[in-house]
């Protein structure tokens, strides 16, 4: 390890709208329950859709379930991988682990893992007797939900599995509601069709106990192709769904209007309780405009305009930002942090080595002036000198540290760990960094560097850390 100055092109902290940090208690938001084996510690699922299949098969991909404990990720793991002979409607079981979700599907009080490949998905459940696949859905084509989300989306009992659905050029929202075997597609109340969906997230923005879906997608109507929009969808199980527009080309100017929220094809969305008021908030990162917006949740739903916006161009260039984005409480104060990936950032002279930025939350929103920059070479204030070097690795060209990010409380202390994927490290084998949460933010004294070989995964096509359960 080398504690050195974090050299990131354009990494200078001179952002406007820096906020002060008010005192006061808030509702915790350390992340979802992902305790699969019921031992009291959250676990992590890592997808490796490019992992080679068994010799002689056309199958590919796997999911590694890594179990948490008081010291972080343990050596225990469970591998889900298409078996020889596995087919999905006559097609190979390929790209397993391309998407992951978690919920208590069978209502037994334990969280189940939902994973999918290109043509099928399955639900795996842990019991005292072991692990079993309790559901499998074979759709044989790519029109099923391809960005899985799970939980309570409608007002009927039972877990729903939903997501944006590709059907040729068009997108809709489809899903299996309340453990139904039938895949139901959503019709929209107007003449809109979604096109080119690029990002989606779910959360409870209005506090009614049901999840809403935010999606970045193009729109096509009688007027033709209308460009990227940020939509909010409430209860996709209804016969006709009304789309609420939070951002569209009409909110964009040249240069972009950061105050209004300008969705682009590369925009990423996530949800979490940034201001600690008990409602999830919607966060959008747009690398091409180097901007970040937050729509605050409230009982009547979010405002049509973002309540917080900032220009990130003095922090990192648009070419460096994204696609990693996660929201969760890292320091246990009840205000969720926003963690942004800059996977193509130049670090210590190494191009596309990657970095992540941890922005604290507060009762009034993100506190940019207290942001931390984390690379494999050190951690410190953005644009400053590394104060410590907890990761037992060094930045290398093309590592893509920050390509994927999730926040999960692995240790059970009420503070979320920031888990960062570097899928291109070591020639494509990949790596995870577990940055422990603490009362002062990301812990600077120690971290975990997790290589796939630790779990018997030894392919340079693993790209381990490219897909993480959120």
Roles of regions detected by a PLM:
Residues 1-11:
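Bacterial N-terminal signal peptides that target proteins for export
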Residues 13, 17-30, 67-95, 123-147, ...:
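Blade-edge motifs of beta-propeller repeat domains
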Residues 27-79, 86, 100, 162, ...:
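An edge-strand/N-cap motif at the start of beta-rich repeat modules
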Residues 29-41, 97-105, 146-154, 159, ...:
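Beta-propeller blade termini
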Residues 38-47, 107-116, 155-164, 207-216, ...:
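Acidic/hydrophobic-patterned starts of short beta strands in beta-sheet-rich repeat architectures
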Residues 44-46, 63-66, 96, 113, ...:
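Hydrophobic strand positions within the blades of repeat-based beta-sheet folds
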Residues 50-55, 120-121, 167-169, 219-224, ...:
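Short glycine/acidic-enriched loop and turn motifs that connect beta-strands
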Residues 57-62, 120, 225-229, 289-291, ...:
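A detector of repeated loop/turn-to-beta-strand junctions in beta-rich toroidal repeat architectures
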């Amino acid at each position: 390890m080398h504690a050195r100055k974090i050299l990131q092109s354009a990494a200078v902290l001179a952002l406007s709208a820096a906020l002060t940090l008010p005192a006061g208690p808030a509702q915790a938001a350390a992340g979802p329950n992902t305790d699969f084996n019921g031992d009291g510690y959250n676990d992590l699922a890592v997808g490796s859709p490019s992992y080679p299949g068994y010799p002689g098969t056309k199958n590919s991909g796997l999911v590694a379930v890594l179990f948490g404990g008081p010291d972080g990720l343990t050596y225990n793991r469970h591998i889900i991988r298409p078996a020889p002979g596995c087919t999905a409607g006559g097609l190979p079981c390929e790209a397993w682990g391309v998407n992951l979700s978690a919920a208590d599907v069978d209502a037994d009080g334990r969280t189940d893992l939902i994973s999918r490949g290109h043509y099928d998905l399955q639900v795996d459940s842990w019991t005292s007797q072991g692990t079993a696949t309790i559901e499998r859905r074979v759709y044989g084509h790519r029109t099923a939900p391809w960005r899985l989300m799970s939980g309570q989306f409608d007002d009927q009992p039972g877990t729903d599995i939903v997501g944006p659905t590709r059907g040729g050029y068009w997108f809709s929202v489809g899903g299996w509601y309340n453990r139904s075997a039938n895949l139901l597609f959503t019709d929209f109340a107007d003449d809109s069709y979604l096109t080119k969906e690029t990002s989606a997230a779910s959360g409870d923005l209005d506090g009614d106990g049901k999840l809403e879906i935010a999606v970045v997608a193009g729109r096509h109507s009688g007027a033709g192709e209308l460009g990227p929009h940020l939509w909010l969808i409430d209860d996709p199980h209804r016969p006709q769904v009304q789309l609420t527009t939070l951002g569209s080309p009409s909110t964009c100017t040249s240069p972009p209007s950061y105050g209004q929220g300008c969705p682009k094809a590369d925009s990423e969305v996530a949800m979490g309780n940034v201001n600690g008021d008990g409602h999830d908030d919607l966060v959008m990162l747009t690398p091409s405009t180097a901007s970040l917006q937050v729509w605050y949740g409230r009982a009547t739903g979010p405002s049509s305009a973002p309540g917080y916006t900032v220009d990130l161009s003095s922090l990192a260039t648009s070419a460096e930002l994204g696609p990693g984005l996660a929201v969760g409480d890292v320091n246990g104060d009840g205000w969720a942090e926003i963690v942004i990936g800059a996977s193509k950032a130049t670090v210590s002279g190494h191009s596309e080595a990657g970095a992540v930025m941890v922005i604290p939350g507060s009762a009034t929103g993100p506190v940019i002036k207290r942001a931390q920059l984390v690379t494999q070479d050190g951690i410190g204030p953005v644009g400053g000198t590394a104060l410590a070097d907890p990761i037992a690795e060094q930045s290398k060209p093309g590592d893509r540290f920050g390509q994927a990010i999730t926040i999960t409380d692995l240790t059970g202390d009420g503070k979320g760990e920031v888990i960062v994927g570097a899928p291109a490290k070591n020639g494509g084998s990949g790596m995870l960094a577990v940055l422990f949460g603490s009362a002062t933010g990301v812990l600077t004294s120690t971290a975990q560097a997790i290589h796939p070989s630790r779990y018997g995964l030894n392919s340079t096509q693993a790209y381990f850390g490219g897909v993480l359960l959120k």
